[in-house]
């Protein structure tokens, strides 16, 4: 399932 929060850089 998709994670919540900003995409990791």
Swiss-Prot record:
Keywords associated with the record? Ribonucleoprotein, Ribosomal protein, RNA-binding, rRNA-binding, tRNA-binding
A GO molecular function annotation here is: tRNA binding
> May I have one GO cellular component term?
ribonucleoprotein complex
- Quaternary structure and partners: Part of the 30S ribosomal subunit. Contacts proteins S9 and S11.
Q: What is its biological role?
A: One of the primary rRNA binding proteins, it binds directly to 16S rRNA where it nucleates assembly of the head domain of the 30S subunit. Is located at the subunit interface close to the decoding center, probably blocks exit of the E-site tRNA.
Q: Which family does it belong to?
A: Belongs to the universal ribosomal protein uS7 family.
Its name, as the record gives it, is: Small ribosomal subunit protein uS7
Protein species of origin: Mycobacterium intracellulare
């Amino acid at each position: 399932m998709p994670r919540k929060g900003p995409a990791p850089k």
